[in-house]
């Protein structure tokens, strides 16, 4: 237990320019607490590694590895002469060898090793910058730290109890710079988490160490009541409950890994999302629920470009098996089902437009394929706020605002903290603007 410790996570959006690294140095240097840093790969590096794996070209592996090296050296010249130069060069040699090996014998393990190189190089680069500024630190790779992952990909979670039992950091003498996004499985093989998994690395470490708080540094001011992509003057949210944050993480722009708050819940540890470059903004704090006398919608999550997939169901006795079969085949294909509603005679699933054709092909290949049709695209709106699910006033506000603007809104499901609806894709922007205005979410 290191109650005075803080965990700081720096993602790829904060690892783009030299100014970003200088800002990280200032943040680390100004802290009076013991610190653990978690890093993602430099901006764009993971995508480049993925592209290289997909191309599968042996002829350009040397040039590709050299370009990855140059990306880090141009941003962090100190890495070429500092204490981590040998480890930096060896990591690049291993990357090149693994790329050649993957061409000969592709495997999930080799692929994970290649992709994890981005985080390893990032940790070495950041250590080089910090060391050059007289900040004592060391790279702490996940396989060395003992970050064990149960499951993999979007379903992967970190074994917090195992970290708690075995992790030893001497934080008084050196700041560990931990690689995010990946860990090891029971066979000691590199295993990746899902998109945004570095968030989960940071919160799992915070829970294991019983740290004071965890901060995820970003390139924006905090969480807004509406995603910035819609260009509406949205309110900045100073506080979110764990539950509200999970809903927004699932049904909005990627602001946080959906599982990131889970290690923190039972301990009540706070999580902050803060802008790296703005000292005057506290960002958004995430923590336990705060009871209010009058429930209100605090934010709207929005998932556009979804295709409703209508499936005809047979007799009552075959409904559950059919839905289970469809869910299983789509799950195996990694097709996310954002909503599933069953009624007498039919089921309605929401999948992304991009996945709709693939989903129907899978259904048509079943031994006894069900009848199905793809309906016009919709947008899923999630109205988020503690206690809104059963609040008649909130329900009436949404319905009356939609009726006043002739918005074809359809209610899907609700929970204690969220109300979910769909609107036709072509009505997305007007629905967001009119509903957000009625719910007082705009400035």
Language model: regions and residue ranges:
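A conserved regulatory-domain signal marking ACT and ACT-like small-molecule sensing domains
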Residues: 283-443
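Short phosphate-binding/catalytic loops that engage adenosine nucleotides
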Residues: 33, 135, 269, 335, ...
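Nucleotide/pyrophosphate-binding catalytic subdomain
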Residues: 1-256, 261, 352, 422-427
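Short secondary-structure capping/turn micro-motifs that flank functional sites
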Residues: 145-148, 222-223, 279-281, 346-347, ...
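A conserved active-site cap/scaffold subdomain adjacent to cofactor or substrate pockets
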Residues: 241-315
């Amino acid at each position: 237990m290191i109650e005075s410790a803080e965990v700081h996570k720096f993602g790829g959006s904060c690892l783009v320019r030299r100014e970003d690294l200088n800002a990280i140095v200032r943040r680390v240097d100004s802290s009076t607490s013991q610190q653990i840093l978690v890093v993602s790969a430099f901006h764009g590096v993971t995508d480049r590694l993925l592209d290289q794996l997909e191309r599968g070209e042996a002829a350009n592996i040397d040039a590709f590895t050299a370009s990855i090296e140059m990306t880090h050296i141009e941003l962090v010249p100190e890495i070429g002469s500092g204490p981590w130069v040998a480890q930096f060069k060896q990591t690049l040699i291993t990357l090149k060898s693994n790329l050649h090996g993957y061409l000969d014998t592709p495997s999930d393990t080799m692929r994970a090793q290649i992709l994890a190189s981005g985080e390893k190089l990032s940790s070495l680069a950041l250590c080089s910058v910090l060391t050059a500024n007289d900040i004592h630190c060391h790279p702490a790779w996940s396989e060395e730290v003992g970050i064990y992952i149960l499951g993999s990909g979007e379903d992967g979670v970190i074994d917090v109890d195992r970290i708690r039992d075995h992790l030893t950091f001497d934080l008084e003498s050196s700041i560990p710079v931990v690689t995010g996004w990946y860990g090891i499985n029971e066979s000691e093989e590199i295993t990746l988490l899902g998109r945004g998994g570095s968030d989960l690395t940071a919160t799992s470490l915070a829970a294991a160490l019983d740290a004071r708080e965890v901060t995820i540094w970003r390139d924006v001011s905090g969480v807004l009541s509406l995603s910035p992509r819609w260009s509406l003057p949205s309110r900045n949210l100073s506080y979110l409950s764990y539950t509200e944050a999970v809903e927004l993480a699932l049904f909005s722009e990627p602001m946080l890994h959906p599982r990131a708050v889970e290690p923190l819940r039972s301990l009540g540890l706070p999580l902050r999302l803060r802008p790296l470059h703005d000292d005057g903004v506290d960002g958004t704090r995430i923590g336990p629920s705060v009871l209010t006398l009058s429930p209100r919608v605090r934010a709207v999550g929005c998932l556009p470009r979804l295709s409703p997939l209508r499936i005809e169901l047979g007799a009552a006795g075959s409904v559950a098996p059919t839905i289970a079969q469809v869910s299983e085949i789509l799950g195996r294909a990694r097709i996310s089902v954002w909503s599933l509603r069953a009624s007498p005679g039919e089921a309605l699933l929401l999948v992304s437009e991009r996945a709709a054709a693939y989903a129907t092909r899978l259904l048509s290949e079943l031994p006894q394929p069900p009848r199905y049709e793809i309906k016009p695209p919709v947008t899923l709106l999630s109205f988020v706020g503690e206690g809104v699910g059963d609040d008649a006033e909130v329900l009436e506000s949404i319905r009356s605002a939609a009726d006043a603007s002739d918005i074809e809104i359809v209610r899907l499901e609700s929970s204690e903290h969220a109300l979910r609806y769909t609107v036709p894709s072509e009505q997305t922007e007007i629905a967001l603007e009119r509903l957000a205005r009625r719910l007082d979410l705009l400035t």
